[in-house]
Amino acid sequence: MFIKIKETKLPRLYVNCYGKGDPTVVFESGLGCTHFDWEVVQNQISKNTRTFSCDRAGLGNSDTGDLPRSSLDQVHELHTVLNKAKVKAHYIIVAHSIGGYNARLFAGTYPKEVSGIVFVDCSHENQFEDRVKRSSSKEIEIVKSQSIGTEQTFDELLISAKQVSEIREKDALRNIPIIVLTADHKGETSAALTEEAWLKYQGDLVTLSDYSKHIIVEECGHFIQKDKPQVVIDAIKGIVNGMSK
């Protein structure tokens, strides 16, 4: 279905609400990605509790709004859409890649509404700034002149990363359960980030909570929800079941 946000210049955002029960599992996609990435996982989780996925502005079935926008802008829009769709807290946020920024900002902005987070090979707030430090001025200009996906330029990503760094000071995730799923990226290479650096960043995400678990997903690429959907399903169920104890 489509949700209109009159408070902004976004005419319509496309959302999927399936299942019944509490908590609500909210899926947050990676940069330039849509709800289709979660199709298998959402269909399975919807058999046990309520689920929600949304195409951000300019992606999938949603209309194009004012682009680009920072992660904090996207978080405020997500909160508005959840309210308009009458999808009430508590939320377990399942985030992929750059969607991890949004999950952390959401938890920091609306701390009483988030009961858990599953990070699916998520980005770290320092990785883009570190890339700038390791690049020549010419390389930086090339990267900054490019649009990343259809949502954010490199400069907007740096702004979003700064927002996450600032929200980290609130320590909003300290007492909520989180599971960090990290792909071994078999068969994938990246000139922007070494495997050692990626694992360091992933390990740091684990320290955000005193109730955290880190799972390395072997034989898997960046899109764990597609390559190994059962791993994501099991992680979500682990947090949901833990809440009922």
Residue ranges and their predicted role:
Residues 11-61:
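Conserved HGGG/HGGXW glycine-rich cap/lid loop of the alpha/beta-hydrolase fold
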Residues 53-94:
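Active-site loop/oxyanion-hole signature of alpha/beta-hydrolase fold enzymes
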Residues 88-126:
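Conserved hydrolase catalytic core segment
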Residues 118-151, 194, 200:
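Flexible "cap/lid" loop of the alpha/beta hydrolase fold
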Residues 174, 180-182:
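Short beta-strand/loop motif that positions the catalytic acidic residue
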Residues 212, 218-245:
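Catalytic active-site module of serine/aspartate enzymes centered on a nucleophile-bearing elbow/loop
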